[in-house]
Amino acid sequence: MKAVTGKRLAKLAESKGWELARIKGSHHIYVKEGRIERVVIPIHGNKTLKIGLQRSLMKIIPVAEGDL
């Protein structure tokens, strides 16, 4: 799996219809109408996300590996 930054995953979430609800520190919180879950994406400059967090967020959004 290709490593991805929080900034890149946030852009992909927005392209899938998720809206930025608020920002608390470096954590961007996204919501989508009709969904109960929130997506919290940590954006720490150009640091890549850890693999477990990346997989979890990709399942919720949903994003395919080919979209990265």
Predicted regions and their residues:
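Active-site beta-strand termini and strand-to-loop segments that position acidic
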Residues: V31-G34
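Short beta-strand
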Residues: L20-I23
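Recognition helix of helix-turn-helix/homeodomain-like DNA-binding domains
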Residues: V39-I43
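Amphipathic alpha-helical segments
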Residues: V4-G17
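Histidine-centered active-site/metal-ligand motif
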Residues: H27-H28, H44
